[in-house]
């Protein structure tokens, strides 16, 4: 057998070994065969859209191009927009219910998306929660902010507080778009801007860069999140974050050790803080009660991890 033929046989055996080894690899360690593709195509904007229960024309060049910018920015900010779509399945039902009860247009739920991306974040300026209340403003709308609890992170209470603020703006401007812009600019600031320019609506007012984009960002997220596949987001319902089943326990006495109390309920301090992000510490003192604390609805929901 010549050397060349010998090498050929060795190479063939090595190739066969690699193929067999690959076939024996457990599925859990194989790379996914799913192919992720991104398209550079952006759908044509509609001629009009329903926004805050009103038909809004998008034929105006300035309005159209400012909205188009925010569509592009958010369409290609895939990680953030994908998270918003996933989180919306968990939080939108609560937001929609409260907005309806408070008589505020449902589209204001998208304000939460641009403010916090549906998470309890703290801004560099100190604003917190889904609705990004400042610590000095929160108590004016009934939210407690102490070293122990921060109700800006309480989804239900902060949403009702936001509704009070939005409705206050609406009473001043008699227009939901202006009320929305005032959420960012402040009602006094928006009034001064309009009066100095002799106009009465946000779309006719020259604003600071942040507020100038604010309403259009909400409009863009509404279009994208209502029609995700049209903008290249293919997120199956089973991959979205479903609401966490919980029940409330009324607390009328101080709890010195919340971790111990949590274990007595069959859960943990970590889960208590997950379900109640407004609780900041390991206790509930007299200043925090009475209050309702959420716990998992049953042992199959967020139970204690065990190996």
Predicted regions and their residues:
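Extracellular LysM carbohydrate-binding repeats and other cell-envelope/extracellular binding modules
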Residues: 271-307
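Catalytic cores of secreted or luminal carbohydrate-active enzymes
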Residues: 209-232
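Substrate-binding/active-site groove segments that recognize
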Residues: 126-147, 159-161, 166, 190-193
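Solvent-exposed, acidic/flexible segments
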Residues: 77, 81-92, 101-104, 123-131, ...
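Short, functionally critical alpha-helical segments immediately adjacent to catalytic or ligand/cofactor-binding
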Residues: 104-119, 179-185, 272-275
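Catalytic and binding regions of secreted/periplasmic enzymes and modules that target cell-wall glycans
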Residues: 166-193
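An acidic, Gly/Ser/Thr/Pro-rich helix-cap/linker signature
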Residues: 5-103
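Primarily a LysM-type cell-wall glycan-binding module
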Residues: 237-266
């Amino acid at each position: 057998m010549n050397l060349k033929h010998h090498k050929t046989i060795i190479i063939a055996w090595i190739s066969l070994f690699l193929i067999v080894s690959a076939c024996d690899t457990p599925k859990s360690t194989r790379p996914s065969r799913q192919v992720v593709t991104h398209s550079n195509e952006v759908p044509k904007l509609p001629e009009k859209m329903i926004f805050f229960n009103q038909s809004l024309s998008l034929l105006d060049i300035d309005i159209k191009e400012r909205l188009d910018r925010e569509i592009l920015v958010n369409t290609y900010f895939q990680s953030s927009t994908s998270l918003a779509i996933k989180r919306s399945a968990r939080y939108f039902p609560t937001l929609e219910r409260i907005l309806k009860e408070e008589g505020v247009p449902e589209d204001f739920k998208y304000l939460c998306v641009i403010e916090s991306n549906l998470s309890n974040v703290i801004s560099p300026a100190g604003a917190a929660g889904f609705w990004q209340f400042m610590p000095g403003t929160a108590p004016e709308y009934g939210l407690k902010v102490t070293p122990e609890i921060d109700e800006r992170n309480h989804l239900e209470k902060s949403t009702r507080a936001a509704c009070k603020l939005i409705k206050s703006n609406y009473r001043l401007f008699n227009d939901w778009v202006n009320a929305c812009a005032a959420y960012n600019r402040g009602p006094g600031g928006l009034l001064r801007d309009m009066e100095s320019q002799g106009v009465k609506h946000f779309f006719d007012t020259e604003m600071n860069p942040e507020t100038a984009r604010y309403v259009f960002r909400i409009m863009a997220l509404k279009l994208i999140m209502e029609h995700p596949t049209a903008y290249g987001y293919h997120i199956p319902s089973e991959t979205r974050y479903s609401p966490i089943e919980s029940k409330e326990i009324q607390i009328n006495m101080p709890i010195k050790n919340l971790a111990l109390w949590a274990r007595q309920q069959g859960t943990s301090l970590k889960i208590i803080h997950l379900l109640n992000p407004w609780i900041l510490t390991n206790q509930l003192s007299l200043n925090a009660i009475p209050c309702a604390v959420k716990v998992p609805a049953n042992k199959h929901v967020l139970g204690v991890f065990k190996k």
